[in-house]
Amino acid sequence: MNWKLTDNKNWDSLEQQFRWVQDMNFVMQHHLHHEEGSVAVHTRMVLEALQQQPEYRALPAQEQEILWTAALLHDVEKRSTSVDEGNGIITSKGHARRGEYTARTILYRDIPTPFHIRENIAALVRYHGLPVWIMERENPVKKLCEASLRVDTRLLKMLAVADIQGRICKDKPALRKLPSYSRCFAVNRIAGERHEALQRVMPAFSTFKRRMGI
């Protein structure tokens, strides 16, 4: 029997079931990256975009539940990290890291979840922004390697694409650079076999570096 966060995925029902979903309505975002408004509006758009992806629809039912739950939780801790800098500029540094902790807590304390499912969801929340912003990191290849040891990068790529599609923003064309190196994020790690996983992933890293000129 597959694990599910909930049987009722209607947004109004989600708000009634989970206080942290209600909280999303009161968290605004940077006007440049999120003209759509609150975290609640963005999250709903992300969920809709995710469910329209052919790759998502082709996943086994359990993986769909894992990815859907990660999408619902991906910005949950913007509520605690958002700072209004003025002029529509709102930052939320550290929301992914804190969101990982919150996701893990919810899926342990509030909704008892099998360990491997809980950790997969928590890791997706932690790294959800990496495919979009990786080239701004000091060592992008190292970051990609780090993520591949913790998260199913096929699912991470799908989540990142939905995160881009599920927003209204002026810089959306720039964000669409993701597909140009999405193959690197589609390399799946082998759970519990890190050495073999690295051997499989490193050729993709080399291709990635050549394409990006790094």
Description of each model-found segment:
Residues 1, 5-15, 21, 28-31, ...:
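Short secondary-structure junctions and interdomain/linker hinges
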Residues 1-85:
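Acidic/His-rich, divalent-metal-binding segments that scaffold phosphate/diphosphate chemistry
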Residues 1-19, 30, 34, 83, ...:
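Proteins with a high burden of low-complexity, intrinsically disordered sequence enriched in S/T/G/P/A and R
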Residues 6-20, 39-42, 63-65, 95, ...:
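Alpha-helical structural motif
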Residues 18, 26, 111, 115, ...:
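Phenylalanine-focused residue identity feature
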Residues 50, 103, 107, 209-212:
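Hydrophobic, Leu/Ile/Phe/Ala-enriched alpha-helical segments that form helix-helix packing faces
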Residues 55-171:
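Divalent metal-dependent catalytic cores for phosphoryl transfer on phosphate-bearing substrates
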Residues 152-214:
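Charged substrate- and nucleic-acid-binding regions of tRNA-handling and nucleotidyl-transfer enzymes
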